[in-house]
Amino acid sequence: MKKKFPAISLSIACVAFLLLLVAVFGKDRMSPDMFKSMFAGFFAEKLTTEQLKEDYVYAIEDEGSKKIKILIAPGHNESSPGAAFLNLREVDMTSELGEEIFGLFKNDDHYEAVLLRGKNGDHPDFTEYFNRERENIARVRDRKRAQMKNYISDGLIRKEEPIPHVTVPEETSLRLYGINMWADEIGASIVLNLHFNDYPRKRINLPGEYSGFSIYIPYDEYGNARVSEAIAEKVLSRLLKYYFVSTYPKEGIGIIPDWELISLGANDTLKAASLLIEYGYIYEPQFKYSQTRKVLMRDMALKTYLGVQDFFGGTSTALSDTAILPYLWDEDISQGDEGKVSVLALQAALASAGFYPPLGKTRDDCPLTGVFKECTRSALASFQENV
């Protein structure tokens, strides 16, 4: 019974503090953000949606104000290359996608974009920081882990069963905690972690059972949870225009709170808003061909950028909502074609017009692939019948 007393005392203290705020400020003078933050989680809210949006406004109105610093973190590196399928490697795909996303934010005056890992390896400033602070990173990680175990055993934090993840090696763990600490060190407000999913199977040279994208966010007890969720909702909405959420049942809600993923700030180790986006399963057909994959990467990057912009309310009407269209068809296409950008553009155009996927099919049945099979034939026939 004694282990429950701290939690009860904490709850009484929170209620008393809330009543004091209402008494001092009056309910009408308190913003919704102030009320919500009282119940945001066990850990103090480190960055609110209101604060982040105010920073964006200042970045627009005052040239001397700091820009929104956003860290683009392509998942994995050569020492830990991540998922693989046939000739595809996750480390290469996230690097390509990272370059696309980085370019969009870099060209927007409201942001200061930082790319953690590019074609030539890690950002030199991160490499210097990691080598210099290596021992301190390990100490902070171990201390935070121990604190979390104590909070859980004392009943102060509710622990939910997590989605199974691959256990990372010691060196990878240290690197990921180091990225979190460096993100806070450089004053990043948003961290976008880029990944491609995989699912265990006996025949690794064949596609797996599941497909679709998912967005992981910090567990709701963490101090960066609420602002991360607000951004994730906007990115999800953008991606849903052409893509579909994961068919893996535990990812089917699209946005999944997770308390174990280090990149999101496991053990409350990150101040910045953080999203870990699995843009699809590496064995999905749309990633097979380099030409169509490159266009899809640009489109996914654009939708990610626009989603973040939607959060701030700053989306430009001059920007198209897709990198696939408009497209000039200058070649014949026919059923059986594979890996053609012209087919991908046709699928996207049919999707925009409401004909793809065809009636009776889902986006899981008929993803945008650049492959002309029955899905495309049926959708095109339906379009021709209705125009």
Where is each model-derived feature located?
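Catalytic-site microenvironment of enzymes
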Residues: 1-386
